Amino acid sequence: GEERVAFTDSLGRTVQIPKELTRIAPSGSVATMILATIAPEYMVSVSATPSSAQYRYLPQNLLTLPTTGQMYGSKSTLNLETLLSCNAQLVIDLGDRKENMEQDLDALQKQIGIPVIFLEADVAHMEKMYRTLGSILSGKEARGNELADFAAETVDMAAENSAKITDEERVRVMYTSGVSG
């Protein structure tokens, strides 16, 4: 079989992942969008069919990939058959840390027989996440570092700009969503 290396994800789970990694499946919509920025040609599936509004922003190969659904959690719509037919080497979950994720991801990994990792991808972890993806995806180190540098600059710029805003200038906004979104 393929050579594997031990990888410790953001939850502290150590997972054996392929050393040469070129076939990845996103666990959901956040992972789909982020992975499309670093290695769209390595993606073997998407979580959902992109909307026509998203078409022009996405790498064209994503538009024809099979959809596997949201892979776990209360809103799980995993299409196991589709996922298994994609021949993914690794399932990547990106986003915010949630309760019981370790158990959820271990259970998913056991169910599908494919290694599953989680990387925290909120604003504070974006730089680290891109560097990590760059280091595990074959030939993607330079792209990962480029995206990580961009993420770091953006966060620094936002922090600098928000520090310049006085209390009087600060805008107060409440964002809510109703039953229909």
Language-model features, listed with the residues they occupy:
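Short, low-complexity disordered leader/linker segments with a strong preference
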Residues: 1-20
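Extracytoplasmic substrate-binding proteins
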Residues: 4, 14, 103-181
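A mature extracytoplasmic/lumenal domain signature
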Residues: 11, 19-21, 39, 47-50, ...
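A short, flexible N-terminal coil/short beta segment enriched in small residues
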Residues: 12, 19-42, 165-176
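A structural signal for short loop-to-beta-strand junctions that line the ligand-binding cleft
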Residues: 14-17, 64-79, 115-126
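Structural recognition of the beta-strand scaffold that forms the well-ordered cores
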Residues: 25-27, 44-47, 90-94, 116-120, ...
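A short, structured surface patch at a secondary-structure boundary
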Residues: 31-86, 90-97
